[in-house]
């Protein structure tokens, strides 16, 4: 072997990938081996964003001392939240509602329907009316979280079969509404279930279309939350067309992403008489700000003006019950308790502290309803 061959061999070995022996530490990236020479915290984007949070002005956070001041605060913050959500889609001049199917079950009747929320945009929903009550019924707009969409809350399994075991983390809570003598108006949120694009539908029932749709909304200066709130408002319009439902006794409830929709809808829509938020009330800081969440949760610039507890405070003095799992790993329980304490202060300034409640339970991110459903029934009573 010539000197030139030896030189080539040496050069090749120097350029070859370094093989780590069994038991050796895994390669950690470009700073591997240089950790002691740098401040690792200065490379952490979450720590960077948390420092920015500390400087967030929260210009419209609650600080009122009496009801008059609280009402003035609500007016300002409600207008700002509407602005931040972006303009709502245009409402169709008529709902063009259509019944697709009616089925009878032992404890309730279920009607599948559609209506036009915005020109060219339909909403699918299910009206579940109880057999243990007399019309006109209180109506609870019921919004599912991420999963298979509205099927997850009306008693339909992943094969399209009826079920009675209340499976999944959402436990068919729309069916549970009827068991408490109220009607459930369960809607399919945009980008969930049947309201997904064809490409996303090919990926399976559990794959939401929040990406790219929520991103598209942001590029348009709008938000997925705004679109979903608008659908809730139009659902309440639809409720007003049904003689078996009482439009003066409308509630709203949802879990997770449905809890997001419920909180913002109740904050902005005065026709919602009572609300139940499951698996969502927390702080932005400790949930969607710090943990990996779906893009449908984000409202650009909101931390310049308010925290989540401030938005929830816009519901006051209308009744609000929040529930939180003590093992919830995406909406941490301690932050949920902190947030509710701030919401409670708003209700107390209104002189209605008893109308705000928080139930915690020994489980993960899931629907519970032990206190929440009786709470809605009590506050939506005729």
Question: How would you label these PLM feature ranges?
Answer:
Residues 5-26:
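N-terminal export signals
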Residues 50-128:
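Non-catalytic accessory segments flanking enzyme active sites
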Residues 121-122, 131-139:
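Proline/glycine-enriched tight loop/beta-turn segments at coil->beta junctions
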Residues 143-230, 287-291:
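Cap/lid segment of the alpha/beta-hydrolase catalytic domain
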Residues 212, 216-220, 230, 234-235, ...:
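Mobile cap/lid helix-loop segments that gate and shape the active-site cleft of serine hydrolases
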Residues 245-254:
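Alpha/beta-hydrolase fold nucleophile elbow
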Residues 322-324:
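Short beta-strand/loop motif that positions the catalytic acidic residue
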Residues 341-342, 347-382:
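C-terminal catalytic histidine-bearing segment of alpha/beta-hydrolase fold enzymes
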